[in-house]
Amino acid sequence: MHPIRCEAVVLATMDYRESDRIVTLFTLCHGKVRGLARGARKSMRRFGGALEPFARLSVELVVREGLSSLRGVDIVTVYPRIRQDLAAIGHGGYAVELVDRLLPDGASVPRLFRLLVSYLEHLDQGGASPSDRRFFEANLLNILGYRLSLDACAACGVEFPADAARRAGAAGTVLCTGCGRYGAPLSAETVRLLHRCLGTGRFGAIVFPPEPLGEAGPLLDGAIGAHLARPLNSLAFLRQLTP
């Protein structure tokens, strides 16, 4: 097979044998790919310091079912300011692990690739905020087909008037007050801000005040957790840094 050249973001790496490294890449043209970088741990000539999480690369690889072959890389950016700030490291590590865990191998999702790159660029410019994390999560769920259903009760199907009271149910569902009488309340402002997250493509444009942030967070956490077999490794560190 002939090698192809494609833009990619490094999601994860793992040492393999004495000198090799297995790299999980989110590529623009082939989706998530795991590639074997031969000699990456001993030789700096072919890969340099490029094979680190968050790095955005132009990669040359031979795509195969299972484990692809990574032939070479050119660095687009390693997002140096992310690596100098603990909050940015926490948010960036969470973002790439979340994409890795939710995206199946070989699924090409250009919109999600652009969302992740935009988030990493925003973090590199000092934008590590809880609001931007929730913006990223809401849009990621939407792109992958897990969009939050904010306008009708997940249990009985009744449509909500614009300012109707809502309750948060299990697994990120939204319920009417009759079906979700014991669920945490969701204010009209929280619902409005979540709708706005799905209507704008710009990080930093939406800021959740403390109360809506406290309501939106568990709802999004539940929606994401419903699609994960186990908790994210990066989440414990992120929770130490931010709400």
From Swiss-Prot:
SUPFAM superfamilies: ArfGap/RecO-like zinc finger, Nucleic acid-binding proteins. Gene3D superfamilies: Nucleic acid-binding proteins, Recombination protein O, C-terminal domain. One of its GO terms (cellular component) is bacterial nucleoid. One of its GO terms (biological process) is double-strand break repair. Pfam families: RecO_C, RecO_N. Keywords: DNA damage, DNA recombination, DNA repair. It comes from the Bacteria. Involved in DNA repair and RecF pathway recombination. Belongs to the RecO family. HAMAP family: RecO. This is DNA repair protein RecO.
